[in-house]
């Protein structure tokens, strides 16, 4: 099981509880370490964990599209299409249609990525496509605070 999430939004609450529950059920679960260097790239170990997982839970939250999670997401969707990785989206305080149609904070995030000269335009297009794909998958909508 691979967990993809934006640490600032969910690491210390929803994701931590989910990770603990999965471990208690003896489900081998991989999540990134908050001590990992934050940046525009993800480690080869993280990519390997995605490729070797049978399931991925994607916790889409307000700041998800501002984070390096988009790189994870593109790899997850690629694996979903190629190797039968099962994807389970959780829409955490975001509307699934905003994810699908990239409205709200998703619009803001992509505007920021498109302005960043260090970010490849093809990568941004891949991230948008991956978000659209995941936004069309039936998932769990968490909207109560």
Regions found by a protein language model. Name each.
Residues 20-24, 42-144:
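Cross-kingdom TIR/SEFIR domain
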Residues 1-55:
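Conserved N-terminal substructure of TIR/SEFIR domains
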């Amino acid at each position: 099981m691979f967990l993809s999430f934006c640490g600032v939004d969910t690491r210390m609450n929803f994701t931590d509880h989910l990770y603990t529950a999965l471990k208690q059920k003896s489900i081998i679960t991989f999540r990134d370490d908050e001590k990992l260097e934050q940046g525009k790239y993800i480690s080869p170990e993280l990519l390997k964990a995605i490729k070797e997982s049978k399931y991925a839970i994607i916790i889409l939250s307000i700041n998800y599209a501002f984070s390096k999670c988009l790189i994870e997401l593109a790899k997850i969707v690629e694996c979903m299409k190629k190797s039968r990785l099962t994807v389970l989206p959780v829409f955490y305080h975001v509307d699934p249609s905003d994810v699908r149609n990239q409205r709200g904070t998703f619009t803001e995030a992509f505007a920021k990525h498109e302005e960043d000269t260090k970010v490849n335009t093809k990568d941004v297009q891949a991230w948008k496509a991956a978000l659209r794909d995941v936004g069309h998958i039936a998932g769990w909508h968490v909207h109560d605070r």
